[in-house]
C-alpha cells in the first residue's frame, strides 16, 4: 500500500515538492525504467523494472487522488 511518505521516497523528493516537480520526476523515472527494461536481455531485470513501473504508476495515482498533482 502506498502512503504519502512512501510515495515521496519512491520519487526521491521531499514533501514540499511542487506539482510540476512531482510530474517531472515521475516522467523522468518512467522514461528511465522503460529504457532499461527495453534494452536489457535479462528477463529478471525486465520483470524488476516492470514492477518499478507499476509502483511508479501507483504513486502517480495516489498523489493524484490526494490532489498533490
Regions found by a protein language model. Name each.
Residues 1-51, 55-68:
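N-terminal J-domain/J-like co-chaperone modules of DnaJ/Hsp40 proteins
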Amino acid at each position: 500500500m502506498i502512503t504519502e511518505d512512501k510515495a515521496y521516497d519512491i520519487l526521491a523528493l521531499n514533501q514540499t515538492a511542487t506539482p510540476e516537480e512531482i510530474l517531472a520526476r515521475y516522467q523522468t523515472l518512467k522514461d528511465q525504467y522503460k529504457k532499461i527494461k527495453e534494452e536489457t536481455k535479462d528477463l529478471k531485470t525486465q520483470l524488476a523494472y516492470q514492477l518499478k513501473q507499476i509502483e511508479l504508476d501507483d504513486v502517480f495515482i495516489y498523489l493524484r487522488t490526494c490532489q498533490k498533482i
